[in-house]
């Protein structure tokens, strides 16, 4: 089970603003459960910037990604497909983790 989650720094503001409400992960990073609170850090520097609450975890195929998934990631569908292929090349089985931000203490929000 994951005890924390990381995101690339480029997604930090989208997460904090509520524009990004899902993350697509591989099976190894899908072991979270609804109601779980996770600290969130940047992938690059391991710098904490908020806590999230997991709402649900749903399996989804790369080939089944839709505009709705893209909107929840705050991207276009072509952007989302490109980003997923960069992170998980050739992977078809993904897991959608739907979340909300629950804590940003000590984080300066611009």
UniProtKB/Swiss-Prot annotation:
Belongs to the N(4)-acetylcytidine amidohydrolase family. GO terms for molecular function: hydrolase activity, acting on carbon-nitrogen (but not peptide) bonds, in linear amidines; N4-acetylcytidine amidohydrolase activity. Its EC number is 3.5.1.135. Residues 6-93 form the ASCH domain. It comes from Shewanella sp. (strain ANA-3). HAMAP family: ac4C_amidohydr. One of its GO terms (cellular component) is cytosol. The keyword Transcription does not apply. The keyword Thylakoid does not apply. Catalyzes the hydrolysis of N(4)-acetylcytidine (ac4C). The active site is at 20 (proton acceptor), 23 (nucleophile), 73 (proton donor). NCBIfam families: PRK04980.1 (NF003443). PANTHER family: UCP029143 FAMILY PROTEIN. It catalyses: N(4)-acetylcytidine + H2O = cytidine + acetate + H(+); N(4)-acetyl-2'-deoxycytidine + H2O = 2'-deoxycytidine + acetate + H(+); N(4)-acetylcytosine + H2O = cytosine + acetate + H(+). This is N(4)-acetylcytidine amidohydrolase. Keywords: Hydrolase.
């Amino acid at each position: 089970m994951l005890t924390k989650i990381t995101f690339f720094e480029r997604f930090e503001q989208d997460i904090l603003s509520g524009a990004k409400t899902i993350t697509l992960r591989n099976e190894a990073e899908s072991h979270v459960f609804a109601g779980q609170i996770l600290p969130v850090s940047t992938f690059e520097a391991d710098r904490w910037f908020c806590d999230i609450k997991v709402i649900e975890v749903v399996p989804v195929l790369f080939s089944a990604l839709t505009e709705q998934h893209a909107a929840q990631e705050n991207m276009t569908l072509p952007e989302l497909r490109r980003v997923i292929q960069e992170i998980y090349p050739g992977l078809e089985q993904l897991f959608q983790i739907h979340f909300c931000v629950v804590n940003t203490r000590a984080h300066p929000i611009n």
